[in-house]
């Protein structure tokens, strides 16, 4: 069913325009690890990994949220080479500096391929940044280290090539004396072509606000992510049974007029030769995102971060008719400790994900089918992986025996199986991070999920996935080793134990420490 995205976008975009008009704004992007590089020069990273599993497939927590770099088929070898350069002084807020990077990952298995998760050039000035290319990103208010995955953009798929202007972190507004800080971005991108879709583009923007000075013990966060797929061509749409309804001879609107409607999705565009019937009664493109809120509390020797991400794909989501669909989380983080204990617990995270409401069961405003769109036949995916939460699954990734016995999982639109079909779920996720022997990092993840068949039947599918990862096992100098074990059991991904051994070397090709 083509998504229904109506005039409630007006309120969102009024807020965005008011905030983006402030000169000190720019990009919002929350990366898995914050960029703290303060050394000019060129650094490198080289890795070799070997992976195996008991059933020949990658366990859930071996492949998920890895930016599409871990293959599905095991055994496999994975080789990674990355180079990052910094020219200039990041500490001098009033002078621009240049950053560039590239990372190439090779998968050697029964379906060998090369992956390019990063390739970018960025110019930065203070909190602001303009970049062209791909960068590893996670969007939204979430604990990036131990999360199950941000609901709309999780770091699960290979990054999308973009041109982006924005901030790298929260930029304080001077006239508020640091009370209010803003993190925002605006970008245009290009999806990789698939068998089904060609020349599809990305529109993305976000605005987030922090209320509270950095020294305060309590700070509030709120904001919105808005993403849209638009433009492109599909032969399947041109030849399909409802082709005239869904496209103009296979083409989806890509003109300047269409772009304005994507950026400012208010009302319908009206009749035009480039618009199909569905375009004239709906919003142009596939719109989705999340409305986030967070609370950061500083304790005596620790901190708490509470956060929520409310998913939306149309008017019903923007008006919270699908509440409580989304993600809810809490993170406990230990303060600085000089303890010499063998085991130092650094962080705990717990999350709850639910998509059971779906705005009800009645059409036209209910039955939200997350990450599906009638015109964009691959759904909210990129290079074969879901862009949002990996808790949802693609039809192509499910066992064929499961698809044969479930009308829900094998449902179709215009005689095609839905690309993302397993999206009615409740999950509990926990994560822990500790330091062992004052140098070895240990990360434990566990996710229990129950998948439903919405109103098709009372059948449910339970799933448990776990992983333990050890890194910084020093071998010699700049060479260290990592070990990861992951296990799946349940009705979706049956019993599977996998292991990954990684040898990593890092260092500088050139190095020039910068002055404060």
Residue ranges and their predicted role:
Residues 56-63, 111-115, 142-149, 193-202, ...:
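Outer-membrane beta-barrel translocator domains and adjoining extracellular loop/strand segments
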Residues 99-191, 211-230:
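Outer membrane beta-barrel
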Residues 28-79, 90-102, 182-188:
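Transmembrane beta-strand segments of Gram-negative outer membrane beta-barrel proteins
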Residues 278-291, 296-516:
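Outer-membrane beta-barrel pore domains
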Residues 1-32, 516:
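Bacterial Sec-dependent N-terminal signal peptides
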Residues 168-364, 428, 446-450:
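Signature for the C-terminal beta-barrel architecture of outer-membrane proteins
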Residues 48-56, 87, 104-108, 125-127, ...:
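Transmembrane beta-strands of outer-membrane beta-barrel pores
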Residues 28-44, 85-99, 124-128, 170-182, ...:
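Short loop/turn motifs that connect adjacent beta-strands in outer-membrane beta-barrel proteins
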């Amino acid at each position: 069913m083509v998504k229904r995205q109506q005039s409630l976008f007006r309120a969102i975009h009024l807020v965005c325009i008011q905030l983006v008009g402030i000169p000190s704004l720019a990009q919002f992007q929350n990366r898995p690890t914050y960029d703290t590089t303060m050394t000019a020069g060129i650094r490198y990273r080289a890795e070799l990994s070997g992976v195996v599993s008991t059933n020949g497939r990658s366990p859930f927590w071996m492949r998920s949220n890895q930016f599409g770099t871990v293959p599905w088929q095991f055994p496999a070898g994975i080789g990674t080479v990355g180079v990052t350069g910094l020219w200039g002084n990041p500490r001098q807020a009033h002078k621009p500096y240049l950053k560039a990077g590239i990372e190439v990952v090779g998968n050697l298995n029964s379906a060998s391929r090369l992956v390019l998760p990063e390739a970018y050039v960025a110019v930065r000035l203070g909190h602001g940044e303009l970049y062209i290319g791909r960068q590893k990103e996670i969007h939204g208010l979430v604990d990036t280290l131990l999360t199950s995955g941000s609901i709309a953009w999780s770091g699960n798929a290979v990054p999308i090539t973009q041109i982006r202007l924005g901030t790298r972190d929260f930029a304080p507004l001077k006239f508020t004396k640091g009370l209010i800080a803003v993190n925002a971005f605006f970008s245009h991108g290009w999806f990789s072509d698939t068998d089904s879709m060609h020349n599809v583009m990305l529109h993305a923007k976000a605005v987030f606000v922090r209320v509270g000075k950095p020294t305060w013990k309590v700070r509030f966060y709120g904001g919105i992510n808005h993403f849209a797929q638009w433009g492109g061509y599909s032969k399947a749409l041109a030849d399909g049974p409802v082709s005239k309804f869904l496209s103009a001879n296979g083409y989806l609107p890509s003109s300047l007029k269409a772009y304005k409607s994507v950026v400012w999705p208010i009302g319908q565009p009206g009749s035009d030769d480039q618009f199909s019937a569905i375009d004239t009664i709906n919003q142009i493109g596939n719109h989705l995102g999340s409305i986030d809120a967070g609370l950061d509390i500083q304790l005596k020797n620790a901190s708490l971060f509470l956060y929520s991400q409310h998913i939306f794909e149309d008017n019903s989501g923007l008006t919270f008719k699908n509440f409580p669909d989304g993600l809810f989380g809490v993170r406990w983080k230990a303060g600085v400790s000089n303890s010499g204990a063998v085991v130092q617990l650094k962080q705990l995270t717990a999350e709850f994900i639910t998509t059971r409401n779906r705005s009800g069961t009645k059409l036209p405003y209910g039955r939200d089918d997350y990450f599906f769109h009638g015109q964009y036949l691959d759904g909210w995916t990129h290079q074969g992986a879901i862009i949002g939460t990996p808790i949802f699954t693609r039809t192509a990734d499910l066992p064929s025996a499961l698809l044969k016995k479930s009308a829900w999982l094998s449902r179709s639109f215009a005689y095609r199986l839905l690309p993302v079909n397993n999206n009615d779920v409740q999950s509990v996720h926990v994560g822990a991070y500790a330091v062992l022997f004052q140098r070895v990092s240990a990360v434990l993840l566990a996710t229990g999920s129950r998948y439903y068949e919405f109103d098709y039947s009372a059948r449910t599918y339970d799933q448990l996935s776990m992983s333990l990862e050890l890194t910084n096992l020093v071998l010699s100098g700049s060479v260290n080793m990592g070990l990861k074990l992951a296990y799946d059991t349940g009705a979706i991904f049956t019993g599977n134990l996998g292991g990954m051994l990684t040898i990593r070397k890092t260092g500088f090709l050139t190095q020039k420490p910068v002055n404060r």
